[in-house]
């Protein structure tokens, strides 16, 4: 529930813009719907102001600030932090010619399985632009894959999240595993248009996303 994170009307028909700053350890990666625009070493007064305390934190800490989102529903807002590694690719927009960076983040033990799905992300994003004739509006598309994610997948705008079991692929999984990873990722990317750009007024029209 977004209400547990920040004051909001947590209903799909209400849209707003969001700006985030994240305080995190320097050996971790901070992610959100939009790309980071500034990153600097955190000062003691940053920590005191944001945490409302004077914590005795060991090691170096960073303050990462993210670009402001377009107007979007609260259920699509996402941010994450952890010891992630990533594989990147580029989608070439057939409508604008823009080069859109796509990246898949996961924990180090799964990073060798990320290349195939990252390639799918780049190909499918460009294909959907051509099919829907609407350009993907965000500066980037990331996916964060975790072994303990509660759901199969979630179409957060610009930061798709999901389980390793449905998003990652290696040669031991065979053709069925390859097709499943491509199918689930393609489904989630389609939701960048059907659900994220065009959003249902209420949950009884969830068929729009599916």
Features from the language model and the residues they span:
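Catalytic Zn2+-binding segment of zinc metalloproteases
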Residues: 189-205
């Amino acid at each position: 529930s977004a209400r547990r994170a920040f004051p909001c009307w947590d209903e799909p028909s209400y849209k707003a813009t969001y700006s985030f700053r994240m305080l995190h350890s320097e050996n971790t990666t901070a992610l959100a719907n939009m790309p980071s625009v500034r990153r600097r070493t955190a000062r003691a007064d940053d920590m005191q102001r944001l945490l409302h305390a004077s914590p005795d934190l060991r090691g170096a800490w960073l303050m990462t600030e993210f670009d402001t989102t377009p107007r979007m529903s609260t259920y699509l807002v996402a941010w994450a932090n952890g010891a992630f590694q990533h594989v990147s690719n580029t989608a070439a927009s057939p409508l604008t010619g823009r080069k859109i960076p796509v990246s898949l983040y996961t924990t180090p033990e799964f990073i060798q399985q990320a290349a195939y799905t990252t390639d799918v992300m780049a190909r499918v994003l460009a294909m959907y632009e051509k099919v829907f004739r609407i350009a993907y509006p965000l500066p980037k598309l990331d996916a964060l894959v975790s072994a303990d994610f509660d759901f199969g997948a979630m179409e957060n705008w610009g930061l798709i999240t999901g389980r390793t079991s449905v998003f990652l692929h290696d040669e031991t999984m065979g053709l069925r595993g390859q097709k499943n990873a491509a199918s689930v990722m393609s489904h989630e990317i389609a939701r960048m248009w059907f659900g994220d750009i065009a959003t249902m007024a209420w949950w009884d029209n969830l068929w729009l996303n599916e």
